[in-house]
UniProtKB/Swiss-Prot annotation:
PANTHER family: UPF0750 MEMBRANE PROTEIN YITE (PTHR33545:SF9), UPF0750 MEMBRANE PROTEIN YITT-RELATED (PTHR33545). It is a multi-pass membrane protein. This is Uncharacterized protein in cccA 5'region. Pfam families: DUF2179, YitT_membrane.
Amino acid sequence: STGGTDLAAQIIHKYTGLSLGMCVILIDGLIVLTAAFVFDIERALYALIALYVTSKTIDLVQVGLGYSKIALIITNEEEKVRRAILHEIDRGVTRLPAYGGYTEHERPVLMCVVAQSEFTKLKQLVRTIDPTAFVIVANAAEVLGEGFQR
């Protein structure tokens, strides 16, 4: 229990869009900082550390471990990679026009969003089709759109 401040955190979360964990750390952090004047600073620092862990746990439970991955793929085998993603992983692919600053050649970039559990398969597919492919990967905290959630 966060001592009743969780309701205030939920209200702030609803109207500001901040994560629930961030709202908890803001409200409870103000209380802990105020208490630092009454109690010693060492206890306040321990409380802030515990508060940080609590807020991260709240966000982790709320969002879950199911981060999606965004892959930007630059390959000489664009069509083969595109088809493999569409048919073997059953995910959509977006083809982005790009221009190589070093090579000075136009070359498409394939962008694909996959679930964490599908990422290893995507890596293996790309590596098998084109071992020289350049792949950039990032975590996507949230993915909205038709057909993504399974």
